[in-house]
């Protein structure tokens, strides 16, 4: 049994002992100062984040999935990051998946006891038909959530890659993952409230993992999200701007190719850059494994 009082995320913050006596302005300054520490803490963890991204790219190239698992705030952040990959990078909802202890209901309300079940984490991956091509990333600010540990142990059993993300050093979940990430943000502004600095650190790291792994499989050209899915009016206009930025064409030219490409931004860009029709552009992209740059050779 882990003594929770020894965890950094459970310790009291010396800077905020008199929090209830501060003015709103004083509390804001203190909270902002604490938040400033997060990016520097994440910077210290960069060497351990890199192999997780490399593993995610490898998983995608083999047809595997990136699966986030967590409870409470940690689980919600995983679900959020996974959901954003669909419109941003044009991947199917089955490629990056967020699982939260207690299921969809736990996104909005607490599901008692769910995070304390080793078996539930295991069962959720069984239900997902986890295979050896997948990467499972267990997220737990405390670093000791049984739901996450059960999932990581099952993933290792079947030969899937495993990674963990904790906001405590020497975390228990680090012992259960091939690629552990530990980020020390110090005690929380409000004692034990890991939705604060810990949650911010987790979101920054998940942003890195999903975004840079997508770059690694050709979802980005220069710094443009060329596989964006235009699911609303704002994204339709953004898609046209992306085509213009990538090719230096006019708005009218971008709109024309966007329509010819059946609203496929990447295809429209290739059509303009290589002066080809839609079908030839599709062939070029297949040969280039989806990388726009490789269609220009």
UniProtKB/Swiss-Prot annotation:
InterPro entries: Etherase_MurQ, Glucokinase_regulatory_CS, MURQ/GCKR, SIS_dom, SIS_dom_sf. It is an enzyme of class 4 (lyase). Pathway: Amino-sugar metabolism; N-acetylmuramate degradation. Coiled coil: none annotated. Keywords: Carbohydrate metabolism, Lyase. One of its GO terms (molecular function) is carbohydrate derivative binding. One of its GO terms (biological process) is N-acetylmuramic acid catabolic process. Its EC number is 4.2.1.126. It catalyses: N-acetyl-D-muramate 6-phosphate + H2O = N-acetyl-D-glucosamine 6-phosphate + (R)-lactate. Residues 56-219 form the SIS domain. Gene3D superfamilies: 1.10.8.1080, Glucose-6-phosphate isomerase like protein, domain 1 (3.40.50.10490). The active site is at 84 (proton donor), 115. Homodimer. A lyase-type mechanism (elimination/hydration) is suggested for the cleavage of the lactyl ether bond of MurNAc 6-phosphate, with the formation of an alpha,beta-unsaturated aldehyde intermediate with (E)-stereochemistry, followed by the syn addition of water to give product. Specifically catalyzes the cleavage of the D-lactyl ether substituent of MurNAc 6-phosphate, producing GlcNAc 6-phosphate and D-lactate. This is N-acetylmuramic acid 6-phosphate etherase.
């Amino acid at each position: 049994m882990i003594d929770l009082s020894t965890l950094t995320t459970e310790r009291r913050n010396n800077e905020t002992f008199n929090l209830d006596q501060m003015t709103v302005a004083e509390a804001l300054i203190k909270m902002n100062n604490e938040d400033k520490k997060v990016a520097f803490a994440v910077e210290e963890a960069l060497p351990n984040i890199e192999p997780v991204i490399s593993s995610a790219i490898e998983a995608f190239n083999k047809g595997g999935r990136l699966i986030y698992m967590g409870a409470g705030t940690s689980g919600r952040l995983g679900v959020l990051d996974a959901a954003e990959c669909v419109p941003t990078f044009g991947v199917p909802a089955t490629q990056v998946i967020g699982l939260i202890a207690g299921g969809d209901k736990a996104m909005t309300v607490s599901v008692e006891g769910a995070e304390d079940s080793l078996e539930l984490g295991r069962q959720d991956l069984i239900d997902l038909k986890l295979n050896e091509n997948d990467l499972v990333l267990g997220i737990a600010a405390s670093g000791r959530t049984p739901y996450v540990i059960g999932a990581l142990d099952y993933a290792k059993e079947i030969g899937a890659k495993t990674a963990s993300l904790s906001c405590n050093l020497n975390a228990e979940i680090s012992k259960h993952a091939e690629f552990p990430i530990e980020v020390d943000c110090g005690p929380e502004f409000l004692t034990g409230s890991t939705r604060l600095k810990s949650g911010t650190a987790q979101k920054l790291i998940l942003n890195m993992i999903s975004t840079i792994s997508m770059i690694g499989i050709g979802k980005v050209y220069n710094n443009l999200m060329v596989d964006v899915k235009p699911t609303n009016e704002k994204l339709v206009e953004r898609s046209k701007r992306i085509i213009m930025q990538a090719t230096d064409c006019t708005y009218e030219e971008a709109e024309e190719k966007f329509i010819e490409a059946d609203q496929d931004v990447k295809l429209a860009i290739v059509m303009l850059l290589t002066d080809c029709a839609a079908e030839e552009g599709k062939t070029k992209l297949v040969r280039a494994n989806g990388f726009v740059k490789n269609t220009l050779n």
